């Protein structure tokens, strides 16, 4: 076991509190209340201006429970040297977090092969690399809001939609050589050789267009709009580039083929009780989110980091934006998410588990059996609980029982997935960790937090009609997962842990994995935590701003 100074979280604990991390006693009511926070003082100054201008009350930190009775601690963004205030990790205060979701929501992938077949067989058009390049030129005019077919059509200012474009993905290397470089997401260039081979083989000779709609449209409309926006501009661009007459009988077939036949959304439509269309957070499966994150191609030999970056992205999207805002609202559930991507506590636990597994079994070399699940999950859970007991500062950092339960279980689940290369085994390791934790501490958190964990083992080891999906295909709307914070992002990380251990280039969909390797995306999906830190420091430059059409100040 590593010494205290070697713990990955020790630097953060020493920065956060004046006392030694091992100290059992602290002080209260001596820190100056909310005024100990520079950010809250800034908030109060702004609120006072707003109240003076409009005469209606606004933010007032003296309302409600007095803030600052305890130390208002800083947070170290895990995997970085950046310390920030907690307020800067609320997604409304963090432009990078917003852009991560914007870049996922505004992405729609549409296969081109069916449309090409209809063009050739029903409309008598020739499809060549040259015509594909011409079509892509047209689409990159139309997608950001340019008119292509009719006169007297209003258009959108390019400065508002500068982040909007379309590119091509193909596993056909001969075709890839003929596609203009500015339109191609080049698999061989962007991925390590072994991963590139896997992706090219999985995609085969199929061709896809990746459409990135304008961020600003997502701010005004919803995720389902992206699918419709892409469909309309694709159809108009095909009609223009291939000079299709609107009155031809086959055009209706072509319209379906080009707009709807091969659509890949990032999120599926939710049922009426959730009332959300495609490309909203509640419909994004865990495996799809894992494929959006690109850490695996940058750090292929570090499965722990790969899993941790996915957990961070998932916790932000599922806990902060989906459950914390769409399903709850207001201040939301920020600190359920921050527990897994700040202060290096989860990092310490996950790397401990990786080392344990590597020494005892080898990475992805153990059979996915209950014996392995019990061994690995128990070892890592007990290690995590011991750290909380040994270092009260870690307990204060994760002041909620459900935060600690999520962190221990995430480490146990990822470690089990590292051992077996199997996400279902990893999920069962998560469930076992929760049960062990409850036995040790009596409870896990708020009432109902552990609902899905109490009944989860049965449906992680068998396939049942309504509850038996493999973890890769489950998502926030899966039965029992629909309103439980501190779980969903970690599940995505367990998926990634299994596939990273196996050396897989993707978790669910090779085309989605390649789509998010695109270097023109605003958010850097190889390093979500570093991007969150930039957002917290107010150094991240987002898309979707309206400066061009508002008065200059």
Swiss-Prot record:
Binds 2 coenzyme F430 non-covalently per MCR complex. Coenzyme F430 is a yellow nickel porphinoid. Methyl-coenzyme-M reductase is activated when the enzyme-bound coenzyme F430 is reduced to the Ni(I) oxidation state. It is found in: Cytoplasm. Its EC number is 2.8.4.1. Signal peptide: none annotated. It comes from the Archaea. Keywords: Cytoplasm, Metal-binding, Methanogenesis, Methylation, Nickel, Transferase. Pathway: One-carbon metabolism; methyl-coenzyme M reduction; methane from methyl-coenzyme M: step 1/1. One of its GO terms (cellular component) is cytoplasm. Its main location: cytoplasm. Coenzyme F430 binds at residue 150. Its cofactor is coenzyme F430. Component of the methyl-coenzyme M reductase (MCR) I that catalyzes the reductive cleavage of methyl-coenzyme M (CoM-S-CH3 or 2-(methylthio)ethanesulfonate) using coenzyme B (CoB or 7-mercaptoheptanoylthreonine phosphate) as reductant which results in the production of methane and the mixed heterodisulfide of CoB and CoM (CoM-S-S-CoB). This is the final step in methanogenesis. This is Methyl-coenzyme M reductase I subunit alpha. It comes from Methanopyrus kandleri (strain AV19 / DSM 6324 / JCM 9639 / NBRC 100938). The gene is mcrA.
